[in-house]
């Protein structure tokens, strides 16, 4: 099984990508047109501190994560990396795809001189992230502005 890890691009299947995201959280691909998707992807790709990484097998998107870089004044003008929206298609889990995505995200954060990386996860996947060097820290807080 050949797995490729790359940034999400305009020639990737937008519907396939959104269907994958449905396994992570709420999204309704039926209301997002190709034009809307491309506009949003253009906004993301024009931001050098925002990267969507996808894993593909035979051209099919089977995993994804988002990396955000937050430039800081503290720690001698370094940055903080944020890993978000980690998802692997349920039919492809336990094949090392999640690990490949996180390793790529960590590499991006290193290249951007991040002094730490933050990610939020549920208790059931803490062990996975601990094996990759992450440690539980503090508590996460959230305020949902749209009620979801």
Swiss-Prot record:
Q: Which reaction does it catalyse?
A: D-glucosamine 6-phosphate + acetyl-CoA = N-acetyl-D-glucosamine 6-phosphate + CoA + H(+)
Q: Which UniProt keywords apply?
A: Acyltransferase, Transferase
- GO MF annotation: an example: glucosamine 6-phosphate N-acetyltransferase activity
Asked if the keyword Transferase belongs to this entry, the reply reads yes
**Which pathway does UniProt place it in?**
Nucleotide-sugar biosynthesis; UDP-N-acetyl-alpha-D-glucosamine biosynthesis; N-acetyl-alpha-D-glucosamine 1-phosphate from alpha-D-glucosamine 6-phosphate (route I): step 1/2
Listed binding positions for acetyl-CoA are 86-88, 94-99, 129-131
What's one GO BP annotation on this UniProt entry?
UDP-N-acetylglucosamine biosynthetic process
Query: Which amino acids does the record list as binding substrate?
Result: 25, 72-75, 84-86, 115-116, 120, 138
Cross-referenced CDD domains:
NAT_SF (cd04301)
InterPro entries according to UniProt: Acyl_CoA_acyltransferase, GNAT_dom, GNPNAT1-like
The record's EC number reads 2.3.1.4
Q: Which PANTHER family match?
A: GLUCOSAMINE 6-PHOSPHATE N-ACETYLTRANSFERASE (PTHR13355:SF11)
Task: Return the similarity comment.
Answer: Belongs to the acetyltransferase family. GNA1 subfamily.
- This protein is called Probable glucosamine 6-phosphate N-acetyltransferase
Q: Whose protein is this, by species?
A: Acanthamoeba polyphaga mimivirus
Q: From which lineage does this chain's organism come? A: Viruses, Varidnaviria, Bamfordvirae, Nucleocytoviricota, Megaviricetes
